[in-house]
Amino acid sequence: MQKFTLLKGLVAPMDRENVDTDAIIPKQFLKSIRKTGFGQNLFDEWRYLDAGFPGQDPKSRKPNPDFVLNQPRYQGASILLARKNFGCGSSREHAPWALDQYGFRAIIAPSYADIFFNNSFKNGLLPIVLSEIQVSQLFDEAAAFPGYALTIDLERQVIIKPDGKELPFEVQAFRKYCLLNGFDDIGLTLRQADKIKAFEAQRLAQKPWLARTLLA
């Protein structure tokens, strides 16, 4: 998992409440047995005017010119600004995968669905919670200033605005540690590889019949 330390990125404002996971990555694109390739179908039904199918070349699609991510001023955005209850709906880890693979590293919103919130941290995506007033101010500024960018300093837990003003945010210490070091669940487990191997060696030495049972 990619480390998250300091991010300076263009902001894309998605002015919708209750954006659910089926809007983030529609169900027809979940059939892949791989963890990659979901970014091209992020917000698919809003992003394109025609219906798509898995494996389709996005260059053959008809983009919706009114959708925020298709507007030239927001191309290359790495910070998504959203409204309350972002990521609601059915549980699917593909949602943070799609956001990450599109290029987003962080989301700023007043609130999130719990499962989406947890899945985001586990996949290297930082979901920041600010008050509705603060989020509305950011929406106003993003609309008023083309090229509006923010800096997110995870170590200090602050968002730095273009004028230098800082917005503090909260993040649980363990989640912060994992993001700063790029540790997902597998990475955390592998840090204990030597201890796991030592335990297994000791267990098999004490109970050798278990090995015979497993090999039978």
Swiss-Prot record:
Record GO terms (molecular function): 3-isopropylmalate dehydratase activity
Entries under InterPro entries matching the protein: 3-IsopropMal_deHydase_ssu (IPR004431), Aconitase/3IPM_dehydase_swvl (IPR015928), AconitaseA/IPMdHydase_ssu_swvl (IPR000573), IPMI_Swivel (IPR033940), LeuD (IPR050075)
Q: What is its EC number?
A: 4.2.1.33
Q: Where is the signal peptide?
A: none
**A GO CC term assigned to this protein in UniProt:** 3-isopropylmalate dehydratase complex
TM annotation in the entry = none
Print the keywords alphabetically. Answer: Amino-acid biosynthesis, Branched-chain amino acid biosynthesis, Leucine biosynthesis, Lyase
Q: What Pfam families would the database entry show?
A: Aconitase_C
- Catalyzes what? (2R,3S)-3-isopropylmalate = (2S)-2-isopropylmalate
To which pathway does this protein belong?
Answer: Amino-acid biosynthesis; L-leucine biosynthesis; L-leucine from 3-methyl-2-oxobutanoate: step 2/4
Q: What does this protein do?
A: Catalyzes the isomerization between 2-isopropylmalate and 3-isopropylmalate, via the formation of 2-isopropylmaleate.
- Cited PANTHER family: 3-ISOPROPYLMALATE DEHYDRATASE SMALL SUBUNIT, 3-ISOPROPYLMALATE DEHYDRATASE SMALL SUBUNIT 2-RELATED-RELATED
What family does the Swiss-Prot or TrEMBL record give for this protein? Belongs to the LeuD family. LeuD type 1 subfamily.
Q: How does it assemble?
A: Heterodimer of LeuC and LeuD.
Q: What is this protein called?
A: 3-isopropylmalate dehydratase small subunit
Please name the source species.
Albidiferax ferrireducens (strain ATCC BAA-621 / DSM 15236 / T118)
